[in-house]
Amino acid sequence: MLGAALRRCAVAATTWAGPRGLLHSARTPGPAAAIQSVRCYSHGSQETDEEFDARWVTYFNKPDIDAWELRKGINTLVTYDMVPEPKIIDAALRACRRLNDFASTVRILEAVKDKAGPHKEIYPYVIQELRPTLNELGISTPEELGLDKV
């Protein structure tokens, strides 16, 4: 994993944009490649999956969360290279309901489907786990709304 990060950094440090915007490799990687590779990783402690889930559930369960914080949290969560756990999505959907933001609930479910990508079994599993919450809050899935046909 560290080797891959170092390779990515070394490649990034040895390429530049040409006149047509294409990337060209430099002939010799200078000292910048070595400096750049050191900056591509952190020596900080790693967050466990349980701590990650708890942090996001706590974030979305804040009683005073506003619409901007909700969207910021959703956008940040979507940028991670993973599908959020159903308990995180549950907390986000409940925050949307507290704010009466139905559009965000649909966006969250669409983002989960998109993040699942080619793994067709993930999205139905998440919907199955969230079904009691969806029924309780009166939230329809994008498929129930016909948005998957557009």
UniProtKB/Swiss-Prot annotation:
Q: Where is this motif: SIFI-degron?
A: 2-17
Residues where Phosphothreonine is found: 141
The pathway to which it is assigned is: Energy metabolism; oxidative phosphorylation
Q: Where in the cell is it found?
A: Mitochondrion inner membrane
Q: Which residues carry this modification: N6-acetyllysine?
A: 87, 113
Extract the Pfam families matched here. Answer: COX5A (PF02284)
GO cellular component terms given for this protein = mitochondrial inner membrane; respiratory chain complex IV
Task: Summarize the subunit comment.
Answer: Component of the cytochrome c oxidase (complex IV, CIV), a multisubunit enzyme composed of 14 subunits. The complex is composed of a catalytic core of 3 subunits MT-CO1, MT-CO2 and MT-CO3, encoded in the mitochondrial DNA, and 11 supernumerary subunits COX4I, COX5A, COX5B, COX6A, COX6B, COX6C, COX7A, COX7B, COX7C, COX8 and NDUFA4, which are encoded in the nuclear genome.
What is the official name of this protein in its record?
Cytochrome c oxidase subunit 5A, mitochondrial
Instruction: Give the source species.
Output: Nomascus gabriellae
